[in-house]
Amino acid sequence: MKLTFLGTSHGVCEPNRKCASCLVEAGGKNYIVDMGCDVMPELTNKGLLPSDITAIFITHPHGDHVNGLIPLVNQCSWCYMSADPLILLPEMSIRDGIKAWLETALHLPLRATLRFEQYEEGVIYDDGILRVEAICNGHMENSYSFIVTADGKRVLFTGDLSNGNGPIADFARMNKGEPFDAAVVEAVHFDPNLYLEPVRENPPKRLFITHYSSYSLEKCCAFKKTMAGEVPVVLLTDGYEVTV
């Protein structure tokens, strides 16, 4: 399973870092976790078209995780008419908002054959290559974290967690059983050093920090230094690629 981080910033863009999105490649297929930024330029640079995307998984409705759906759905509604990604949403109001924007701003109807599905907690996707389990978290209503399994590997994408105490309230509850091969964790809504205890209780093989800000960077670096020799920690930047 290969991960390419297309966007690693938090609620707003920072220099050289766009809002959240990750391309997941497994078994010759391409999937996307969150679309907080327009991923079309990055996909094009990788030689991918919307028709090459099998499924898209959105963790929660905030704009820094969904805004990139607008240009993708726009282009799939008039140019890439054969593109058929399954778009899995925590609430259908996201689709309704995109539909209204296309009709109002572009006078363009939403392509009727585009597939949007609302999911709830539990296994939300399994095509025999990639499996996604959604777990509720406390960030907001209809906010989820994902456990993505492919190629015999398990990766946790936290999405956004509870404000103030996400590592304790949410991450600790998810970080059970067989250690994750990788955990992709956010670090802007709380002190990232709150991860210390739950990470040490069940260390993932690798930990990737995303969705951090310039004002949380110092604390993220302190957390990474504390974890040295225990768990490899990477502060992600856009374009970072890793095979799990």
Mark where each language-model region is.
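Active-site metal-binding motif and surrounding structural segment of the metallo-beta-lactamase
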Residues: 38-88, 177-184
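Conserved beta-strand hairpin/beta-sheet module of binuclear metal-dependent hydrolase folds
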Residues: 1-46, 142-162
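Structured loop/turn residues at beta-strand edges in well-structured enzyme cores
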Residues: 48-51, 112, 128-130, 177-178, ...
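Structural motif
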Residues: 29-31, 52-55, 130, 153-157, ...
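Short, well-ordered alpha-helical microsegments
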Residues: 40-41, 95, 141-143, 164-167, ...
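Binuclear metal-ion centers of metallo-dependent hydrolases, dominated by the metallo-beta-lactamase
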Residues: 168-182, 191-244
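Metallo-beta-lactamase
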Residues: 82-143, 150-151, 233-243
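Active-site metal-binding loops of divalent metal-dependent hydrolases
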Residues: 8-9, 35-38, 61, 137-139, ...
